From Swiss-Prot:
The keyword Nucleus does not apply. This is Ribosomal RNA small subunit methyltransferase G. It holds the Pfam family GidB. It comes from Bacteroides fragilis (strain YCH46). It is found in: Cytoplasm. The lineage of its organism: Bacteria, Pseudomonadati, Bacteroidota, Bacteroidia, Bacteroidales.
Amino acid sequence: MNTTEQTSSLPSAGGENGVKLLLKYFPDLTEEQRKQFAALYELYIDWNSKINVISRKDIENLYEHHVLHSLGIARIIRFRAGSSVMDLGTGGGFPGIPLAILFPDTKFHLVDSIGKKVRVATEVANAIGLKNVTFRHARAEEEKQTFDFVVSRAVMPLADLIKIIRKNISPKQQNALPNGLICLKGGELEHEAMPFKHKTSMHNLNEDFDEEFFQTKKVVYVTI
């Protein structure tokens, strides 16, 4: 199935329901974005049956626990056109793929050390016609390019992550928010963030999203 067929085909019930959830919080999605988000359901169901990138117990929560969670980053920043973002430890494409759909004029570079996960993310992005994403199978330490922001979802402790990605943050500023690291994390984070408290801010996603899943979820931003 080519990209045009994939994005224009009728969405599954799972995809339709997922898009309804997203529209609750992002009502301005274009028709193309809605089609792309809807297509994710069948694609991840199919790929997850071959390569486990999402817990099989959690795949039915794809839109709430993975897609909407990824879009939580958009609650603290709207990336300007031409911005560049690296998703470190992307796994099956989170948060990079949902963000790339939401911000089609921003360039996203998705990196993971596990090749089969990179394959899934690449195939999903190709199937929905994303043109603003690139992929690399590599360890974080091997990536030398610079970006406006690095995003990540609970990959490792903040101190370790900051040490690794400091080299990847561009000194050139083009967004309202200074360049840095944006992480999706959960639970008690004050101790973890303490060494960087003067450069760190936390946004509670339960202020934006009603679902119980988000009660302890945060977006952590660190200026680099």
